[in-house]
């Protein structure tokens, strides 16, 4: 509204204004005098005075808590317009379809689809690529200054793909690759040697390869076509590579040396040992393989000294810190490798020993050692630990001290004493029988067994010259050996005549207690 008013002129000047009222739609010509606080309105068309009212200022209008319906509707319309503008702005950055061309009914036209990148999605993608690519000007659009910050992916008339794009494959010609799944642990760097057939020489080269694929086993190319390679399940992927020394690499910390036959070790005993020693010379990070497996296929029988060759390989594996696994078929060898690959990331809790706590009745380490001896239970182990201060005193005690403990009878004392005093390695004992007579005696040992109850020597006849010992039972419990040679005939139960008859009944008693 425009008005002109002069303070010096007493006669007010009138101006003609056109005002539109949204409620009553009445147009009037008013002569208005505007002040900051009060406003006076006069109507020039009619001489009738009107009711005087005060027009509130902008600050007073904002202080009012209740607004009129007109103001509310205007604000809602303004918000809708802002939202529509923001939506149109995002639609311009989304997938745009060109309109169909108007053709006749006989011809068919297909829409030309042009995919354009979305700024909100590209901001979240951090893909490291080695090659330099040129970015399109649409990929870096200015930020959207609108109240709606949710990204608009595609209009309602565009059909989204039913299945997602495969991993590590580009979505379109102008978009980068999708980020691959996280792999744990990371890639493994190693230096391998490659063989050149033209120059007949080896050359070392550093290659970075990720051995942590979920279902992939890296095999030596020499294993191609073997029966074991055809025995893996369909879930395992075999990738052949030029590995000179290890035959298989299961992951970044597990490698396998495979001996396909014991006959190879029999003909060349140093072959597998030289291959294992050559591993550290070609692979810079060979120490990172914490699990090293020596897989052996035993194809020899017992008559061909199969056990002897396995013992030799076991000593080689212990010296070189390898784990020896013996299989009896190539299918079984494939199952072992597949099991190692399948249970690679599994926790070892199912195969760990679950020791019961001592508070709940479990055994301590000292009790486990003592109860490993036969006839010693947990109560006896507790008694020994209470009466002796250290384990050294327990293993150096005497029979008299053990017999004083509660629960230790003569038999238990003797068994425990024999166990803690016997050597770790026993040599086969050769016993000979001698007599005081001038005639030589022939002894034939048929069966030797250890018995803790009785000592029996059974002879076939009563002749002291030819005694055949059929059963010898050694006892260390109650009886002692009589070393007096004069009582030899009496100990045999004889009467001095050499017939073995002690009571004169004509029968020979062939029993001796030593």
From Swiss-Prot:
Region (Disordered): 1-52, 426-514
Low complexity bias spans: 1-47, 429-476
Transmembrane segments: none
Keyword DNA-binding: yes
A Pfam family recorded for this sequence: Rad10
Chief localisation class: nucleus
Entry's Gene Ontology cellular component terms: ERCC4-ERCC1 complex; nucleotide-excision repair factor 1 complex
Subcellular location: Nucleus
Molecular function in Gene Ontology: damaged DNA binding; single-stranded DNA binding; single-stranded DNA endodeoxyribonuclease activity
Any GO BP annotation: UV-damage excision repair
InterPro entries on file: ERCC1-like_central_dom, ERCC1/RAD10/SWI10, Restrct_endonuc-II-like, RuvA_2-like
Keywords carried by this UniProt record: DNA damage, DNA repair, DNA-binding, Endonuclease, Hydrolase, Nuclease, Nucleus
Protein family according to the UniProt entry: Belongs to the ERCC1/RAD10/SWI10 family.
Quaternary structure and interacting proteins, as annotated: Heterodimer composed of ercc1 and xpf/errc4.
Function: Structure-specific DNA repair endonuclease responsible for the 5'-incision during DNA repair.
PANTHER family for this protein: DNA EXCISION REPAIR PROTEIN ERCC-1 (PTHR12749:SF0), EXCISION REPAIR CROSS-COMPLEMENTING 1 ERCC1 (PTHR12749)
Protein name per its UniProtKB record: DNA excision repair protein ERCC-1
Organism: Dictyostelium discoideum
Gene that produces this protein: ercc1
């Amino acid at each position: 509204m425009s008005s002109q008013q002069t303070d010096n002129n007493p006669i007010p000047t009138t101006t003609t204004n056109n005002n539109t009222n949204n409620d009553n739609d009445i147009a009037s010509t008013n002569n208005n005098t505007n002040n900051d606080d009060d406003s006076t309105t006069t109507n020039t068309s009619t001489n009738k005075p009107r009711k005087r009212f005060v027009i509130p200022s902008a600050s007073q209008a904002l202080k009012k808590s209740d607004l009129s319906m007109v103001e509310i509707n205007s604000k809602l319309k303004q918000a809708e317009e802002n939202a529509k503008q923001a939506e149109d702005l995002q639609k311009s950055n989304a997938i745009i379809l060109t309109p169909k061309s108007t053709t006749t009914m006989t011809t068919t036209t297909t829409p030309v689809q042009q995919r354009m990148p979305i700024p909100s999605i590209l901001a979240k993608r951090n893909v490291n690529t080695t090659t330099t690519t040129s970015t399109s000007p649409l990929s870096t659009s200015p930020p959207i200054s609108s109240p709606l910050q949710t990204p608009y992916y595609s209009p309602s008339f565009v059909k989204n793909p039913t299945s997602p794009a495969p991993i590590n494959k580009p979505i379109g010609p102008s978009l980068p690759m999708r980020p691959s799944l996280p792999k744990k642990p990371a890639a493994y760097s190693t230096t391998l040697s490659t063989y050149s057939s033209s120059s007949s020489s080896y050359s070392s080269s550093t290659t970075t390869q990720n051995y942590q694929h979920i279902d992939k086993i890296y095999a030596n190319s020499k294993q191609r076509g073997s029966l074991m390679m055809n025995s893996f399940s369909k879930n395992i992927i075999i990738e052949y590579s030029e590995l000179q020394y290890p035959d298989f690499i299961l992951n970044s910390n597990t490698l396998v040396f495979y001996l396909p036959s014991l006959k190879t070790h029999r003909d060349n005993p140093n072959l597998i040992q030289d291959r294992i020693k050559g591993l550290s010379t070609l692979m810079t990070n060979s120490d990172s393989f914490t699990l090293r497996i020596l897989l052996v296929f035993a194809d020899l029988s017992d008559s061909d000294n199969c056990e002897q060759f396995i013992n030799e390989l076991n000593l080689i594996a212990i010296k070189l810190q390898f784990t020896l696994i013996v299989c009896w078929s190539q299918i079984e060898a494939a199952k072992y490798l597949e099991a190692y690959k399948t249970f690679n990331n599994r926790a070892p809790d199912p195969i760990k020993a679950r020791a019961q706590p001592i508070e709940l009745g479990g055994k301590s380490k000292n009790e486990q050692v003592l109860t490993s001896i036969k006839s010693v239970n947990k109560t006896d182990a507790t008694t020994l630990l209470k009466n002796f201060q250290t384990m050294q005193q327990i293993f150096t005690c005497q029979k008299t001290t053990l017999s004083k403990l509660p629960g230790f009878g003569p038999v238990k004392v003797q068994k425990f004493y024999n166990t803690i005093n016997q050597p770790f390695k026993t040599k086969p004992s050769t016993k000979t029988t001698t007599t005081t007579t001038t005639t030589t005696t022939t002894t034939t040992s048929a069966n030797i067994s250890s018995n803790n109850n009785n000592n029996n020597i059974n002879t076939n006849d009563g002749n002291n010259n030819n005694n055949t010992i059929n059963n010898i039972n050694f006892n260390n419990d109650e009886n002692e050996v009589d070393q007096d040679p004069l009582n030899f005939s009496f100990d045999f139960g004889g009467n001095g005549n050499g017939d073995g008859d002690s009571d004169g009944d004509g029968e020979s008693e062939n029993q001796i207690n030593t």
